[in-house]
Amino acid sequence: MRYFVYNHHDFWQWEDSNSELMDSEVVFMWSDWPFRNEVKTLQSMGKKVIVYEHGFGALFDYELNNRDFIADGYLALGDESKESLIRAGVEPRKILVTGNPIYDDIKKSKHTGNEALYVALHWVRDVRYYNQTVFEQLKGAYPQFNWTVKLMEKTGKMVANKKWISNSDGNILEEIKDRLPEYDAVFTPRPSTFESIARLMGIPVYVVDQEQSYKDDGEPELMPLNNTYLKIGEKLPRQKKINMDEYIKRPSLSLDLILDWTKTL
């Protein structure tokens, strides 16, 4: 079967496209509602459009933010994403729980040292002051840690002795898997795909802004999760239990099985 892939932040981890867009029978996209006209055009040409979950919790967007579902089918990371889509109104037959190969080989290990990583907020607007303020508060409250700041191109500059800087257009997920085991605790205002990898590795994740004070009115709601929230200055709490098997299927399905499923739509 001929298929074409729109990759996004390297999250499509199956085989690359085996045809050009115009020759394809199936088109895998990272979302549909922002590209309504393109999706409709592709469907009018007889192509099936399939949306894959392009980050941890991404498919919750339909339920939480009332997005239109236009694609022919959806590939969910786990059962929780599938159930969210069903609550949003997507027919169960149009949802396949696939996992993602990027998660398949992650193993849990012990992390008892003092290397801490602050994963700074990367946002569509300038949040440099917010990031720097939170980082300074963390350093002051928890001096027992050696601190590193995790930055991306959308984060903006920060003042820190140690930085880990990534480019979302590069092979960012493999980079995260390679380097993240160096750290013993992760602190962030907003958990995302990065923190899902940390949790699978057994690294404690502390969410430092339960009130989401960085958000402006009208900005999208985020996926609900049993996060371990930390009020900066208080003793580090015990990690709350999250059954990651409910959110990420492992091992992931093969592309052959996914393509066979598209024939049923």
Language model regions located:
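Conserved catalytic-core segment of nucleotide-activated headgroup transferases in glycan assembly
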Residues: 4-5, 103-161
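Catalytic binding pocket for nucleotide-activated donors in carbohydrate/polymer assembly enzymes
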Residues: 92, 193-254
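Short acidic, S/G/P-rich loop/turn micro-motifs used as interaction or catalytic elements
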Residues: 9-13, 33-36, 122-130, 154-156, ...
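Short, surface-exposed amphipathic charged segments that create phosphate/polyanion-binding patches used
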Residues: 67, 108-118, 222, 239-240
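Hydrophobic acceptor-binding patch used for acceptor engagement in glycosyltransferases
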Residues: 185-186, 204
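Active-site and donor-binding regions of nucleotide-sugar-utilizing enzymes
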Residues: 1-106, 172-182, 193-196, 200
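Nucleotide-activated donor-binding/catalytic signature segment of Leloir-type glycosyltransferases, i.e.
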Residues: 157-174
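Well-ordered, non-membrane alpha-helical segments in soluble/globular domains
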Residues: 9-16, 36, 128-141, 180, ...
